[in-house]
Amino acid sequence: MSGVWGAGGPRCQAALAVLASLCRARPPPLGLDVETCRSFELQSPEQSPSAADSGTSVSLLAVVVIVCGVALVAVFLFLFWKLCWMPWRKKEASSPSSANPASETLQSPSSRGNMADKLKDPSALGFLEAAVKISHTSPDIPAEVQMSVKEHIMRHTKLQRQTTEPASSTRHTSFKRHLPRQMHVSSVDYGNELPPAAAEQPTSIGRIKPELYKQKSVDGDDAKSEAAKSCGKINFSLRYDYESETLIVRILKAFDLPAKDFCGSSDPYVKIYLLPDRKCKLQTRVHRKTLNPTFDENFHFPVPYEELADRKLHLSVFDFDRFSRHDMIGEVILDNLFEASDLSRETSIWKDIQYATSESVDLGEIMFSLCYLPTAGRLTLTVIKCRNLKAMDITGYSDPYVKVSLLCDGRRLKKKKTTIKKNTLNPIYNEAIIFDIPPENMDQVSLLISVMDYDRVGHNEIIGVCRVGINAEGLGRDHWNEMLAYPRKPIAHWHSLVEVKKSFKEGTPRL
C-alpha cells in the first residue's frame, strides 16, 4: 500500500491530497467509498503530505519561541547586573568607613577604661587638645583622637560649650561641611580635669584678632597727626605804616622744623605772598643746616588800608636743595590780617606750620546768601559777587558764571546758572536761584556752587567750587545751620573756592 501512495507524479500527489481532504470531511460527500476513506485515514503521518507540512511549521515555531525566550532572559540578566549589582557593590565598598561608629560603640569595657585613663593623662590631653584644634589647611582628624573624643562624650553627660570666635565666614562653614568624618568641636568637653583657663581658651589657629587692626588704625591716625604736628612753628609780626600805606611783615624765626636732608637737618627759607597778588613774591635768606633758624628780616607790601580786609598773608617754608627741586616743608595762611590787632603797632604772632607738598593756589572767593521759607518749602540762594578769581584766559581775565547744583545722596537733582560776566575777575551778579525743597528733606540735600569760566570754543572750565549743606565741612556747614536757625532771613557769607574733588567732579557741557 505504501508503494501505491508513493507512486505517481505531482498531479497524482495533488489528487491524493484532495481525496484525503474529502475523506476527512464530516459527513463525507455522497458517492465516496467508505473503505477508500479508511485506507486514507490509516496511512502513516510520514506519507501524508499535510502532516509533513504541519510538523515542519510547528518545529520552526518552537525554534523561534526558544530563541526569543533566551534573548529576553539575557536582556533581563543584563539589566539586573547594571541596576542592582553595581550599586550594591559600591555600597559594600564604602560600608567599612560608615560602619566604624557602630564598631566603635561595641568596644569592650577594658578598652573604654584604657581610653579614660588616657584622657586623665595630662600629656594625652595636650595631644588631644592639639588634635581637636583644627587648622584650615589640615582638615583630617586622626581616627584614634576621634574615637577617644566620642568615648569621652558618652561618659560625661554634662556638656560645656567651648567659646569660639563670634564672627563666622563662609570659609568656616564650607570647611565644616566637607569634613569626611564630622565632629562638633565646639561641643567638646574635657571635664573637670582641665583648668578653667584652658577650657575657656578659644582656638588660636586661623583666628582674626580685630583688636590688632584697631590698634593699627589708631597707630596710623597717630602717625598722621604726628606728621601734621611735626612741621614746626613760625614766628612773625605785622605792622601797618599809615604814612607810606605799606604793610610791614617781619619774619622772626622758625622752631622745630622737620629734617629734609640725609644728615638730619634742613636748609630752610620762607616765601611771602600778599594774596591775591602772587606776582609780588618776597623771600628770606637760606639758613644752612638748622632746624631752628632765626631770620629777623622785614618785607614791605604797598597796599591801601581799605584793601587790607580783602588781603591774605601766605607764608611758604621750603628746604633749599642745590641739585634738585626745593622741598616744601609747609605753609601758613592768615585770612584775617586784623586777627591780632589793628596793625597800628607791631604785634608778634606764632602759627603752626601746616603740612603741604605744594603751594596752595588761590582760586578766589564767592559771596552768596541763603534764605529758607519753611511754610512754602522754598530755598533761595542769591549769588551776590565774586572777587579775586583765578585768570583762566590768555588775556589775564575770565568770563565767569555761577552754576548751582542741588544734590541728594550724591546725585544731582537740579542745576541752575547765572548770567556770564565778560572779562573780569571780580564779577557782580545779584541774581537769585530758587529751589523747592520740603522741610522734611532739608537734612538730605546740599548745594554745590561752581564758578565756571565760559569758553566759546571747547569745554567750559571750572575755576573753583564750594559746598553748603548738613554734610559739608567748615563754613559750608555753619552757613547752612545758621540759615535753618533763622528762617525767612537772608544769611550772607564769603566762601573760599577750592579745587574740584573727585566726588564733586561732573561734566561741564557748553552753554
UniProtKB/Swiss-Prot annotation:
Renumbered residue ranges of the record's region Necessary for cell membrane association (isoform 2): 483-511
Domain of life per record: Eukaryota
Composition skew (Polar residues), residue ranges: 104-113, 160-172
Obligatory cofactor(s): Ca(2+)
Record-listed Ca(2+) 1 binding positions: 261, 267, 319-321
Residue positions binding Ca(2+) 2: 261, 319, 321, 327
Positions of Ca(2+) 3 binding: 321, 324, 327
Residue span, C2 domain: 230-351, 362-495
Keywords, sorted A to Z: Calcium, Cell membrane, Cytoplasm, Cytoplasmic vesicle, Disulfide bond, Membrane, Metal-binding, Phosphoprotein, Repeat, Synapse, Transmembrane, Transmembrane helix
Membrane topology: Single-pass membrane protein
Cytoplasmic side: 81-511
Region (Disordered) location: 92-119, 157-182
UniProt subcellular location: Cytoplasmic vesicle, Secretory vesicle, Synaptic vesicle membrane
Gene3D superfamilies: C2 domain
Main location: membrane
Spans within the Vesicular topological domain: 1-59
Region of interest: Cysteine motif: 12-38
Low complexity bias locations: 94-103
Quaternary state and interactors: Isoform 1: Homodimer; disulfide-linked via the cysteine motif. Isoform 1: Can also form heterodimers with SYT3, SYT7, SYT9 and SYT10. Isoform 1: Interacts with STX1A, STX1B and STX2; the interaction is Ca(2+)-dependent. Isoform 2: Is not able to form homodimer and heterodimers.
Domain notes: The cysteine motif mediates homo- or heterodimer formation via formation of disulfide bonds.
Job of this protein: May be involved in Ca(2+)-dependent exocytosis of secretory vesicles through Ca(2+) and phospholipid binding to the C2 domain or may serve as Ca(2+) sensors in the process of vesicular trafficking and exocytosis. May mediate Ca(2+)-regulation of exocytosis in acrosomal reaction in sperm.
Protein name (record): Synaptotagmin-6
Organism annotation: Mus musculus (Mouse)
Phylogenetic classification of the source organism: Eukaryota, Metazoa, Chordata, Craniata, Vertebrata
Gene name for this UniProt entry: Syt6
